[in-house]
Amino acid sequence: MRNIDLKMAEINKKFKAQIINQGTDIIEVAKIPFSSPTANWMTYGGIPVGKITEFFGGEGGGKTTSALDICANAQKKFNEVFEQHREKVLDEIEQLKEKDTKESKKKADKLMSDLMEYVERGPRVVVYIDAEQTLDVQWAQLLGVDTEAMILVRPQEQTAEQVLQIAIDLIATGDVGLCVLDSIPMLVSQNIFNEDMDKKSYGGISQALTVFCSKVTPHLTQQQCAFIGINQIREDLASMYNTVSTPGGKMWKHACSLRLRFRKDTLLDMNNGELTSRAENPAGNRVGIEIAKTKVCKPDRRIGYYTLNYTEGIDVLADIITVSLQYRILKQGGSWYYYLDEEGNVEVDAENNEIKFQGKAKLLDELRNDEEFKEDVISRLDKVMYNENK
């Protein structure tokens, strides 16, 4: 064994953590997916686990909706991981019991004891820090969030430092798989908390966030917890090019591995047809996403859109069409949409007729009504996206 290997083991033992690893032992970054295939396509699988992600943009842009969507998918993922591990351990226990030896019985008892403790802890949880006090529980449930299982933190008169410390303490337990802070500008730092309203202050919460980022980052990595900070935008008065900035200071931006900007785009009717900005009764809108920064995937898919329906939530089927066109599972020719096989030829049905649809509305109806066709498209889409994201 090399001297450096001995020293690495010594250092890891000293600090009681695996802080030094050989390159081949580096853990691949896991992702929590969006429901939107377009958002997953842009980010190569979703937001990174063990790192900080920022959702920022103007009011009504889709930041909170997208964060709640991630919460719902995180809960599903945590439950699946929990059940898979439980089933795996139960299988191991059964195999040990079949051996019927003293040693195997001892191992089985130990595994059962560990399993009971694991089951008692349950799946990992989502923490939502509602600093804005504006969380709509019904909307969250519509998006698929199990609000009963989610831990909701609603600060009353706590300072930014206290709220951020609460987040660190909860993440450090190891039971939290995702923490969302909504939103950064609503936090008030200690140095201005007790000041009068008319007294000028400088720096805002930058200092508190600087300390927070330094403290929380190792916990996120060690506990494999994802963190989303929702942020607003401000007009940059110092710029002559009508640019915008975000509160929180430079350290916050540096600490974020992924920064996504959300914009409210075109209004839509019930059939996803475009409406004017003055439409009185829109049924939804497109949500524009721009990757402002990424350190966890290639930055080659900077801009995309997903469809938001005001009564049903995220319109996954409309998104499936968009991404299927990118991967040539579907092909558009004029107003017609063609379903392609893996060789790029138009698929035919049992009567040897081409599988094609005139207009996006017809294709959407087919995806809604033909479960077999929908599952086939989703299966092929998942396959190519999974292989690409590995």
Where is each model-derived feature located?
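A short alpha->loop->secondary-structure connector
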Residues: R121, L143-M150, E195-G204, V244-G249
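The Walker A/P-loop phosphate-binding site
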Residues: R2-A149, A172, F357
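Phosphate-binding/switch loop-helix module in NTP-utilizing enzymes
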Residues: L115-M116, P155-C225
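Residues immediately C-terminal
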Residues: T134, M186, E235
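Phosphate-binding/switch region of NTP-binding enzymes
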Residues: L170, Y202-Y327
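N-terminal cationic and glycine-rich segments that engage phosphates or anionic surfaces
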Residues: I192, E235-S239, G333-W336, E351
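C-terminal regions of RecA-like/P-loop NTPase motor modules
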Residues: M1-N21, K88-V119, L267-K390
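Residue-level preference for the first positions of well-ordered beta-strands
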Residues: I52-E54, V125, G177-V180, A226
